[in-house]
Amino acid sequence: MSGHSKWATTKHKKAVIDGRRAKSFAKLIKNIEVAARVGGPDMAGNPALELAVTKAKKTSVPNDNIDRAIKRGSGQLGEAIDYQTIMYEGYGPQGTAILIECLTDNKNRAASEVRLAVSRNGGNMADPGSVSYLFARKGIVSLPQNELSEDDLLMAVLDAGAEEVKSEGENFEVISEPQDLPAIRSALTEAGIEYDTDDAGFVPSMQVELDVENAKKFMRLYDALEDLDDVQNVYSNADVSAEVMAQLDED
């Protein structure tokens, strides 16, 4: 599992996705505000803002919300909120490594809530650098498998800088260097292949395969972290077999 896509596509996750729609919108809006604050409101000259807006539109965030976020972030509606990116590290079931990426305007609140979620759900916080060395920052494009074959997808993106195509549950993930994301997106568009998400994230260099009981424990921990307002992304080297995933979906 490259980061978190497999956990996000279980039936368990789908069952609660409507309840988390507003929270997802809030995280996307926060990304837009930060991008506008750092690089200004002009998408033509601010690639980070263009990417944040594209992601928001793909998730059906209303245009009015997007426009207000750009204005708020660039200071057009008064003083912009000063968000900071913080990365926490931890361990989950079976010694799995976890990176917790926060975007917050209150470091103390974020730290307290993350520690509480981890400790209450069978995990342990780790010192900076303890697990981050197990991950590399990569470009990750996620798309539904549908009738697409892995070979056809690889042929479409190989010349654009794709390093690997992975099968992740019901999705494919195209892995590349972060700077190659625009070329990957263009290659997919030219090939008529629709994608769901594209972002820079953290990919593990090694994986830990979980049994059913530890997979359930990990999912509880993952859910608790994803539910926190300050948490933007959760990355892990936890993996499960197709058989274990099927059992999780049955519960």
UniProtKB/Swiss-Prot annotation:
Entry keyword set: Cytoplasm, DNA-binding, Transcription, Transcription regulation
GO biological process: regulation of DNA-templated transcription
Main location: cytoplasm
Molecular-function annotations in GO: DNA binding
Cellular compartment(s): Cytoplasm
HAMAP family listed in its UniProt record: Transcrip_reg_TACO1
UniProt name for this protein: Probable transcriptional regulatory protein RSal33209_2002
Source organism of this protein record: Renibacterium salmoninarum (strain ATCC 33209 / DSM 20767 / JCM 11484 / NBRC 15589 / NCIMB 2235)
